[in-house]
């Protein structure tokens, strides 16, 4: 079997030195890089910006990201801008991300939207390996990009797989395929006349139905203020999943920020930091 040639790859390990979380074993090459950590508002939790220096994902691109959190480490990861998937007439784009979270560690991954343009084909496979007492908050936003005919769903497909393991046991397998050629995405059971999809996972030992009810109460007013749909469900473990349907990226971002803020205030007793990207 031929060795995989990566368009970009990145490895990052975060550890706790007793006072704050620091990075080591940083490696990146080609189209992916990670900027030096920022400690926003003098927080002990570093924020890392992951950058695609090419500006977008092109036909045949392959990406690999591996993040390790050692015991008691905490980190916030984000992108510097939207992930743009351009047309892929001959092949497709693949991205593989693995997150290994050790005891009592916590990772926030708050990404910018994935924008699939006309005739784009995108596959992403995320693997999360947690311990019983580690935690994570992860988000995805999927949006259609510009098309020559002005229609919303002109990409070929967006296929996202998320696998979550706790102590090596598979607890969540989320296999999402959005393929306009095979299904009417604006129909019932899919996007239902909406164009933008937001998702989030939160895994933590303190998550139970009461916590989920409180999260839903914190975001319920958005459905009165905006044209959107919000669903929150308990996972088959101590965690929850959020799904949002709407027609604007900004609405999804506002809702996910509210969820993240509630989590940080309730469990970690701190405010979330504004991720400056301008």
From Swiss-Prot:
Keywords: Chaperone, Cytoplasm, Nickel insertion
GO MF term set: nickel cation binding
Any coiled-coil regions, as ranges: none
The keyword Membrane appears for this protein: no
Intracellular or extracellular location(s): Cytoplasm
GO cellular component: cytoplasm
One Pfam family it belongs to: UreD
Family recorded in the similarity comment: Belongs to the UreD family.
Subunit structure comment from the entry: UreD, UreF and UreG form a complex that acts as a GTP-hydrolysis-dependent molecular chaperone, activating the urease apoprotein by helping to assemble the nickel containing metallocenter of UreC. The UreE protein probably delivers the nickel.
Entry-linked PANTHER family: UREASE ACCESSORY PROTEIN D (PTHR33643:SF1)
Function: Required for maturation of urease via the functional incorporation of the urease nickel metallocenter.
Descriptive protein name: Urease accessory protein UreD
Taxonomic lineage: Bacteria, Bacillati, Bacillota, Bacilli, Bacillales
Gene for this chain: ureD
